[in-house]
Amino acid sequence: MSRKRPQPPVKPFKKKPNPLKAAKVTEIDYKDVALLRKFISDRGKIRSRRITGVTVQEQRELSKAIKNAREMALLPYATSGR
C-alpha cells in the first residue's frame, strides 16, 4: 500500500513575447542578416522556439531563411567548440 505524495500546485508558465511581432516584421528574408543573427546562438546553431518565443510557422520560415543565408555565405555554419 503505497500512498502518493501530494503534488505541489503547478505554476502556469508565462508565454514569451514574440520578438518578430514586437519588431513588426511581416516577412522573413534570408538577406536580412541582422534579424537572423538574433535567432542563432554564438556557435552558429539555430535557437529553438522554446528559447526564442516564435510560432511554429515563423520557426519554419526562420530555419529556411537561415539555411538559405548560410548557402549564400551570409551567415556561418555551426562551429565546433575548439
From Swiss-Prot:
It holds the Pfam family Ribosomal_S18. Binds as a heterodimer with protein bS6 to the central domain of the 16S rRNA, where it helps stabilize the platform of the 30S subunit. GO terms for biological process: translation. InterPro entries: Ribosomal_bS18 (IPR001648), Ribosomal_bS18_CS (IPR018275), Ribosomal_bS18_sf (IPR036870). Keywords: Ribonucleoprotein, Ribosomal protein, RNA-binding, rRNA-binding. One of its GO terms (cellular component) is cytosolic small ribosomal subunit. The gene is rpsR. One of its GO terms (molecular function) is structural constituent of ribosome. Belongs to the bacterial ribosomal protein bS18 family. This is Small ribosomal subunit protein bS18. HAMAP family: Ribosomal_bS18. Part of the 30S ribosomal subunit. Forms a tight heterodimer with protein bS6. It comes from Bifidobacterium longum (strain NCC 2705).
